[in-house]
């Protein structure tokens, strides 16, 4: 959250070199709000990579792949051309929706019966998508792609709307037990204004999702053609590292 880091590891997982760029572009238009221009995340990523290449002794042609890991729960809304419609809402943002979509009566009754109705309402109030739909309905109507930050950076690297199942931490219609988007009948699709077409394809961590193109290679200094591999959200990666 505080910075972007570019890290070089060997095939045994040993850290060989790193560079770090502080993120100083966060904005708080109102108390409790926290946003950042998605393009600012990208520029910081590019700067960190270029700083790494400027001082490392590791040859670029020895690098074999790229993995992106990001802060969890930060959301990005894009239009049909893949352009950001508004600043990214950061996971620390405290705004809450007050007008939430109604659930069908049978879901409402079932959730009430098992004592989960208030929990689902909390989920709805916390969901960034519900806040945007309530307060910026014209913008939400133009939203063609709704991504977590990891999905946005994967898109910038590869031109594909693909993300890792291990990065889906946030108020999105994800089935955590099965590791996929929720089934069409699931209450989450009624609790949120998100359509399935807005969401990225999900793949397991470790899957090759694309490759570095010429434009990205120029911006980041990462060699063109390297595979981009699905990673995991920051907390998940930290937990794995501490095992």
Residue ranges and their predicted role:
Residues 12, 112-233:
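Gly/Ser/Thr-rich active-site cleft segment
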Residues 237-238:
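Thiamine diphosphate
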Residues 80-85, 102-110:
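Hydrophobic or amphipathic alpha-helical targeting/insertion segments
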Residues 241-243:
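Alpha-helix C-terminal capping segments
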Residues 27-29, 98-102, 175:
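Short, charged, surface-exposed secondary-structure boundary motifs
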Residues 93:
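Carbohydrate-associated surface elements
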Residues 1-87, 142, 217-227:
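N-terminal glycine/serine-rich phosphate-binding loop of ATP-dependent small-molecule kinases
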């Amino acid at each position: 959250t505080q910075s972007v880091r570019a890290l070089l590891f060997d095939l045994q997982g040993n850290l060989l070199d790193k560079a770090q760029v502080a993120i100083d572009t966060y904005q708080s238009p109102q108390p409790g709000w926290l946003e950042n221009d998605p393009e600012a995340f990208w520029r910081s990523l590019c700067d960190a990579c270029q700083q790494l290449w400027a001082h490392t002794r590791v040859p670029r042609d020895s690098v074999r792949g790229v993995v992106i890991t990001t802060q969890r729960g930060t959301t990005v809304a894009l239009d049909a051309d893949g352009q950001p419609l508004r600043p990214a809402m950061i996971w620390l943002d405290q705004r809450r929706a007050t007008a939430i979509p109604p659930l069908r009566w049978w879901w409402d009754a079932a959730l009430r019966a098992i004592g989960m109705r208030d929990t689902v309402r909390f989920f709805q109030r916390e969901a960034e998508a519900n806040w945007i739909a309530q307060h910026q309905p014209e913008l939400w109507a133009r939203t063609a792609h709704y991504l977590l930050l990891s999905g946005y950076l994967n898109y910038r690297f590869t031109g594909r709307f693909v993300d890792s199942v291990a990065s889906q931490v946030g108020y999105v219609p994800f089935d955590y037990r099965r590791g996929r988007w929720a089934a069409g009948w699931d209450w989450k699709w009624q609790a949120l204004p998100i359509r399935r077409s807005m969401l990225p394809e999900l793949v397991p961590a470790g899957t090759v999702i694309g490759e570095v193109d010429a434009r990205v290679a120029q911006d980041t200094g990462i060699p063109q053609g390297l595979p981009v591999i699905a990673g995991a959200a920051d907390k998940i990666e930290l937990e794995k590292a501490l095992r």
